Amino acid sequence: MNKIKLNKFKREIAQVYDRRQDTYDRGKAGRWHYDLACRLVECVDVRSGQRVLDLATGTGMVAIEAAKKVGDSGQIIGIDIASGLLAVARQKIADARLNNITLKLADIEVLNFAENSFDCVMCCSALPLLTDVPADLRLWHSFLVPGGKIGLCVFADTAFVHGVVLQKVARRYGINLTMSDLTGTPDKCRSLLTTAGYRNIEITTEQYGSYISLDSSADKSWDTSLQHPHCYPLLNLPSQDLEKAKAEYIEELQTLVTDKGIWNDMTTYFVVARK
């Protein structure tokens, strides 16, 4: 598979997801990813014969569900920077005997499709990984036919308790970790898309949260977080401060413990709008 030119941050993102290629679809997390993909396709109301662009397609969950909807007369193009995830997607597509999906290794922030190329553009869960979301939304707007739809799956700024607590602790050390800030509320989502030129914006809010155990999550979640490029700024702290930050992180989580465990909010917004 051909390589693409990526900046350091995007190379690191691709490496993180390539390391997960064998596990991404598995277990509770894999089921959750699949549920989000199916719900997004449902909210967009993908139809027979449509041409669909799936941005950050990953292991092809959205692409495959959309392909079933568009049928043989439609076409899906899935784009991702992680070659390992695309390899998984290719195998899944072959196993499903679908011939209406084309996968491409490319950066979704610098695509050059012609204007008015797609009936639908979708991006599931990947917006926090992008470097210029407002510009990206304007670019994707140009790809849509008049009246075409964009569909986004994004998260509230209250979602994912480990990330929320990590952001809080990081701010004490002068570090701003941006996660779901741009899409953190329905009003923010609406403003973001309106500014990019979209209209008829509809937002469906759903909750995928659950209670989790502190014993099984604190140390592991800290270590896992530091392996993600978004959190690399924390690694620049002196070792003493980093250990202090970790202790504060665990203390903050401890304050959230109830008799049911810690509530891990997973408020999700399915945003659909037209060109």
Q: Predicted segments — roles?
A:
Residues 2-50, 61-65, 85-88, 96, 151-176, ...:
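Conserved class I S-adenosyl-L-methionine
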Residues 51-55, 59-111:
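Class I SAM-dependent methyltransferase SAM/SAH-binding core
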Residues 3-8, 32, 59-61, 182-275:
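Conserved Class I S-adenosyl-L-methionine
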Residues 109-121:
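A short acidic, Gly/Pro-enriched loop at the edge of an enzyme's catalytic core
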Residues 119-134, 156:
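A short SAM/SAH-binding and catalytic strip from SAM-dependent methyltransferases
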Residues 134-149:
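A short glycine-rich, Lys/Arg-flanked "PGG" loop and its adjoining helix->strand segment in the class I
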